[in-house]
């Protein structure tokens, strides 16, 4: 393992003329370490396994069936559709919206490289954005959760069988939820960019809704988990507050509309909303790092001089991940994996890799580098770091294990996922009751349904992965793990001539 760590450091510390060979914008020479195109295909396919609602004729994950067809009916609202966020049967609006923002961003930045996978990626975005339109159909209201998490987690059953309460929770002026509402606005705005050319009418509808939802989020301020704590915590509490989502939402609306109103909003409120906070963890809860990268693009690529300070804010985040520089603040395992938290760490690996590649794209366009404590860091070097992280995920690690289900010869077989771990309805038409399913949860048998493309939480700090279904911290997949990975894989597949 020490050797792997040394090789990792060597890869990211090479002079840029050597790093360019590893991760230049131009095509690579020599064999690719992995089949990135195959991984891309599978990373998008995963979303079909997470679908809730009436499945379309084009559904490729055939062992899944219709589910949640009465969602919202208890309050006479149509909330059918969307995605189950992870291995349960819940629709949590906060991580769902973030997943759609990141999946849309993957398409916006790298969709032009996806070729035959582009339509599948668009379909995945649309399945989510259609649901978010339903969740925001009523002014000054966002329906943010379907299902009682405590009751859902007391059962282990297929989504097609679920009989737990499908309680609906919302934010409105009396129960504000700025964080989840602003994230929903960001998702709608980002999705509008995906469909701007292929479906202009749909894109216009998305951006109009994004504007309305953001206005509501900004006007009625409050953290959604304050009032809804018994229902959304400890699952998806908003630990970082709502300031990051307001900045993030404004950034996406500025990018989607080019309306100077949002530019003014960012300029006037950026510091108050934490633009320069040194929080270097980017995920479903804290969006500061993503917002800094996104806003920096307006300066680097679109030459919006008023946002010049965001180049420095973005550089600060990027430099925190560059090993061997005075600004390095990121922990890596001995095998070379970026390690933030033990619970679902792979989400930070994929989101950070995406931001590294995206920022490298912006820097290359503007012919700029990053100064990390006086050390010049090139776009090629950022790409090298990102590629090493993706390679680790795909199997270049001490265990020789791919953490993407269905990719490679060795991958997790006992993932923490109800639908995957229980027989499909086709194989077992009889209902499997709430408590009956727990036999599968604690079984050592491989999941009968392979959830192709699912990326699990990943190994621990010692690069070890037990592959136990009951170990949700390491064995559970989630939409927000896959969403940014889609963009990273598209870039890598293209750079190696696989697309």
UniProtKB/Swiss-Prot annotation:
Q: Where in the cell is it found?
A: Secreted
Q: Which GO terms describe its molecular function?
A: cellulase activity
- Tell me which UniProt keywords the record has, alphabetically: Carbohydrate metabolism, Cell wall biogenesis/degradation, Cellulose degradation, Glycosidase, Hydrolase, Polysaccharide degradation, Secreted, Signal
User: Which PROSITE patterns does the entry mention?
Assistant: GH9_1 (PS60032), GH9_2 (PS00592)
Q: What class of enzyme is it?
A: hydrolase
Q: Which GO terms describe its biological process?
A: cell wall organization; cellulose catabolic process
Annotated signal sequence range = 1-19
Q: Which GO terms describe its cellular component?
A: extracellular region
Q: In which tissues is it expressed?
A: Expressed in flowers.
Question: Which residues are the active-site ones?
Answer: 88 (nucleophile), 416, 467, 476
Q: Is this entry keyworded Ribosomal protein?
A: no
Q: What is its main location?
A: secreted
Catalytic reactions of this protein: Endohydrolysis of (1->4)-beta-D-glucosidic linkages in cellulose, lichenin and cereal beta-D-glucans
What Gene3D superfamilies does the database record attribute to this sequence? 1.50.10.10
EC number(s)? 3.2.1.4
Tell me its family: Belongs to the glycosyl hydrolase 9 (cellulase E) family.
Per its record, how is this protein called by name?
Endoglucanase 3
Q: Which species is listed as the source?
A: Oryza sativa subsp. japonica (Rice)
